[in-house]
Curated annotation (Swiss-Prot):
UniProt gene name: ARP4
Species for this entry: Kluyveromyces lactis (strain ATCC 8585 / CBS 2359 / DSM 70799 / NBRC 1267 / NRRL Y-1140 / WM37)
Species classification: Eukaryota, Fungi, Dikarya, Ascomycota, Saccharomycotina
Subunit architecture: Component of the NuA4 histone acetyltransferase complex, of the INO80 chromatin remodeling complex, and of the SWR1 chromatin remodeling complex.
Cellular-component GO terms for this entry: nucleus
Composition skew (Polar residues), residue ranges: 339-361, 389-405
PANTHER family: ACTIN
Pfam families, per the entry: Actin
UniProt protein name: Actin-related protein 4
Segments of skewed composition (Basic and acidic residues): 362-374
Keyword Transcription regulation: yes
Length: 520
């Protein structure tokens, strides 16, 4: 298959590749199509026999144990942790599933989480443009891609995936990093809760079952099976079926839903080892309830239990305007990304020299000015104020946070609705009504029945002044690759092709300049 050279970025006849690496699966395919041509697990099998190393990327071979095989992750918490294997997996998918002969002349769009580090983004550009020799590339935020897939350029994306749950406001297709929130209560955590409930039972994967009726007989293998292979098989088979079959979310908190639970019937699931697992309604509803009210004591040792839900990002949404000093040259091309690119007015230039603490920091913001001369006056005026008014004001501040939402304790982990509330309050007040009217629910774990109605109920109770509307894809399977679908739509737009970053531009200005000027 020959690939036409990428000569004009404004043309419409450009076949781009879209890569969407997630925590559970990695989706790869052509732009302009409605589903990815390659869906592979975000893990690989490393088989070492007699000094030789073989790597397996397809899911079905990974479910069959081999001597000396260990399964290792490529993506964790939506971030690529093994770049060498990621490149090898992408090349395998392009050659095997997409029948791609050469990357030259073809652009590629890569989705990434909003909290992706600067080092990881530099590595992305290096792999795509240098190692894999794509003609051009673009890095798109997952939440921005989801907004394009739903046709909502301004929305609030609630992504409940395998490792991470994320809430991100998207304004005109751009994700606001400083208003994004996340926690680590998602599908993987539900797997842990299910396994904890089933103890002391041993969860036996299908490949270890020789016979399950009338009596269970475990298969004996001639080699030792690595623990990672057993965990991978259970995660892809038993836990997935369990969550899709038995889990349900109550329309309101379980404490106020007890009477309705008493009328619910029990449900059962046949385990791979032949046992019929029977669960009452209270147990089935309690698993997914932790998406809303996580219990910190249930977290396994070493689990990243963030209590604030704040996303730490290396970049800033705030971009200072570039102004020119009076009497200086208007050509600021050579001074971009320097202190001179945002000069102060001539009247205050001497003041800036006298006050070195007023220099902009790395985020482009200036520190708060410390005025010692005016502090005495302010102190005197504060003493004159009525003491009763001060006491009332201080008590009000102690009980009600500034955003108007009931504060959680220091040791309480934020649930999904807490993340939405925090993200909404961090956004501009003029945008909140639009965001509330376009709440997009996506991610593999969002397929649990009752999730959308419960989020709507909790939001109407916590923020009654706003009118909320939940949006989600009617195809449940599509929610697992909705980020890829948005990237496919984005890369196929004729007006988007001017945003491609070519290899020549990368070699000319370098990755640091590109990340600051083109991929903020």
């Amino acid at each position: 298959m020959s690939n036409p050279a990428l000569q004009v970025y404004g043309g419409d006849e450009i076949n781009a590749i879209v890569i969407d690496p997630g925590s559970f699966v990695t989706n790869i395919g052509y732009s302009g199509t409605d589903c990815p041509q390659s869906i592979m697990p975000s893990s690989y099998g490393n088989v070492e026999t007699d000094g030789d190393t073989k790597r397996i990327f397809n899911e079905q071979p990974l479910l069959f144990p081999r001597a000396g095989m260990e399964i290792k992750p490529i993506v964790e918490n939506s971030t690529i942790v093994d770049w060498d294997r990621a490149q090898e997996q992408w090349e395998y998918a392009l050659n095997t599933d997409l029948k791609f002969e050469s990357n030259k002349g073809t652009p590629v769009l890569l989705t990434e989480p909003i909290w992706n580090s600067e080092a990881s983004r530099k590595k992305s550009l290096e792999i795509l443009l240098e190692s894999m020799e794509f003609e051009a590339c673009y890095l798109a935020a997952n939440s921005s891609a989801v907004s394009f897939a739903m046709g909502r350029p301004t929305c609030l994306v609630v992504d409940i995936g395998h490792d991470v749950s994320t809430v991100s406001p998207v304004i005109d297709g751009m994700t606001l990093s400083k208003s994004s929130t996340r926690n680590y209560v998602a599908g993987k955590y539900l797997n842990h809760l299910i396994a904890k409930n089933l103890k002391p039972r041993e969860i036996v994967p299908i490949f270890q079952v020789l016979k399950k009726k009338p009596d269970f007989v475990k298969r004996t293998l001639s080699f030792d099976v690595n623990e990672s292979v057993i965990n991978f098989a259970n995660e892809r088979q038993f836990f997935q079926e369990f969550k899709e079959t038995l889990l349900h979310i109550a329309p309101k908190s379980l404490s106020s839903f007890k009477d309705e639970l008493a009328t619910q019937t029990k449900r059962s699931l046949e385990a791979p080892w032949g046992e019929e697992l029977i669960f009452d309604a209270d147990t089935r509803y309690s698993f997914a309830e932790q998406l809303f009210r996580p219990v910190k004591e249930d977290f396994p040792e070493g689990w990243p239990a963030s209590t604030d839900g704040i996303v730490k990002t290396w970049h800033n949404d705030y971009v200072p305007l570039k102004r020119t000093k009076p009497g200086t040259s208007t050509n600021t091309k050579e001074k971009e990304n320097t202190a001179e690119s945002t000069p102060v007015p001539a009247s205050t230039e001497q003041e800036a020299v006298d006050s070195p603490s007023q220099e902009p920091n790395e985020n482009g913001k200036r520190p708060v000015e410390n005025k010692e001369d005016s502090s005495n006056n302010e102190q005197n005026s504060n003493e004159i104020k009525n003491e009763d008014a001060n006491s009332n004001e201080s008590s009000a501040k102690a009980t009600v946070p500034s955003n108007g939402i009931q504060a959680k304790g220091e040791d309480e982990v934020a649930g999904i609705v807490d993340l939405i509330n925090k993200s909404m309050m961090e956004a501009d007040v003029d945008l909140r009504a639009t965001l509330a009217h376009n709440v997009v629910l996506t991610g593999g774990t969002s397929k649990i029945p009752g999730l959308s109605d419960r989020i709507m109920h909790e939001l109407n109770k916590s923020l009654p002044a706003l009118k909320f509307r939940m949006l989600s894809s009617g195809h449940l399977r599509e929610r697992q690759y909705q980020g890829w679908l948005g990237g496919s739509i984005l890369a196929s737009l004729g007006t988007f092709h001017q945003l491609w970053v070519g290899r020549e531009e990368y070699e000319e200005v370098g990755p640091e300049r590109l990340l600051k000027d083109r991929f903020r």
